[in-house]
Swiss-Prot record:
The gene is rplB. This is Large ribosomal subunit protein uL2. One of the primary rRNA binding proteins. Required for association of the 30S and 50S subunits to form the 70S ribosome, for tRNA binding and peptide bond formation. It has been suggested to have peptidyltransferase activity; this is somewhat controversial. Makes several contacts with the 16S rRNA in the 70S ribosome. It comes from Chloroherpeton thalassium (strain ATCC 35110 / GB-78). Part of the 50S ribosomal subunit. Forms a bridge to the 30S subunit in the 70S ribosome. Residues 232-242 have a biased composition (Gly residues). The lineage of its organism: Bacteria, Pseudomonadati, Chlorobiota, Chlorobiia, Chlorobiales. Residues 37-49 have a biased composition (Polar residues). InterPro entries: NA-bd_OB-fold (IPR012340), Rib_uL2_dom2 (IPR014722), Ribosomal_uL2 (IPR002171), Ribosomal_uL2_bac/org-type (IPR005880), Ribosomal_uL2_C (IPR022669), Ribosomal_uL2_dom3 (IPR014726), Ribosomal_uL2_RNA-bd_dom (IPR022666), Translation_prot_SH3-like_sf (IPR008991).
Length: 280
């Protein structure tokens, strides 16, 4: 998927780049797999902001995606490859031999007319989903389950994948996109291949308005606020912690910039062999 760059005829097109969409085969989604998607604006049921910097944006329908890939032994043909406004990856519409239609995350290299299947007996082929115990070591996988039968939860965004580095006993070891080494039960399913839309990370929105179209509101630095609005607000000049306080904090008073926020007693911590690589 090449990235297209416009000539800087206006300030909004000077830094703007967008995908070519050449892999998209239709602009009409499957109606039976669409559900309304009401925007919350970052508010909970009490009307209070629980997720900042959210609101506005274009209306969207949610596409029901098959993350479980549980139609074992039934072959399917790729009918279309479509754009999904709710995620960075493209989606593929599968038409199964029994007549059912389902959306899946479109792997890189998949084409209309390709045959795809899932289950323990499936071939090691891009787009096929099978348990980790049936996948050879060294294969790149995506849409990985954390618990058997729960559906894929890891490596689902554009261009992401994990590498199966080892299998020992009841667990398989995966190198995640973050660099983390993590154990997962060998009964968990994963899909072979890399998620498509690889050039997504090279795109530039070009102007603030395009960010608003996506439902993303502006972010204001805590240092630029007043003390009543943020723990890091106030002070004379650019005081890092605001008004002489010792450590930078989040808007709710939790220490930020260096503090580990993962729960110490989380059960799945024992499955992490090595923490993710630090971003330097």
């Amino acid at each position: 998927m090449p990235v297209r760059i416009l000539k800087p005829r206006t300030p909004g097109t000077r830094f703007f780049s967008y995908p070519s969409f050449e892999e998209i085969t239709t602009d009409k989604p499957e109606k039976s797999l669409l559900v309304p998607n009401k925007s919350t604006g970052g508010r909970n049921n009490n009307g209070r902001v629980t997720s900042r910097h959210m609101g506005g944006g274009h209306k969207r329908y949610y596409r029901i995606i098959d993350f479980k890939r549980n139609k074992d032994g039934i072959p399917a043909k790729v009918a279309t490859i479509e754009y999904d406004p709710n995620r960075t990856a493209r989606i593929a519409l599968l038409s199964y031999a029994d007549g059912e239609k389902r959306y899946i995350l479109a792997p890189n290299g998949i084409k209309v007319g390709d045959l795809i299947e899932c289950g323990p007996e499936a071939d090691i082929k891009v787009g096929n989903a099978l348990p980790l115990k049936n996948i050879p070591v060294g294969i790149e996988v995506h849409n990985i389950e954390m618990r058997p039968g729960k559906g894929g939860q890891m490596a689902r965004s554009a261009g992401s994948y994990a590498v199966l580095v080892a299998k020992e006993g009841d667990y398989a070891t995966l190198k995640m996109p973050s660099g983390e080494l993590r154990k997962v039960r060998v009964e968990c399913k994963a899909t072979v291949g890399v998620i498509g839309n690889l050039e997504h990370e090279n795109l530039s929105l070009g102007k603030a308005g395009r960010s608003r179209w996506l439902g993303i509101r502006p972010q204001t630095r805590g240092m630029a606020m007043n003390p009543v609005d943020h723990p890091m607000g106030g002070g004379e000049g650019k005081s890092k912690s605001g008004g002489g306080r010792k450590h930078p904090k989040s808007p709710w008073g939790q220490k930020s910039k260096g503090l580990k926020t993962r729960k110490r007693k989380k059960a799945s911590s024992k499955l992490i062999v090595r923490r993710r690589d630090s971003k330097k």
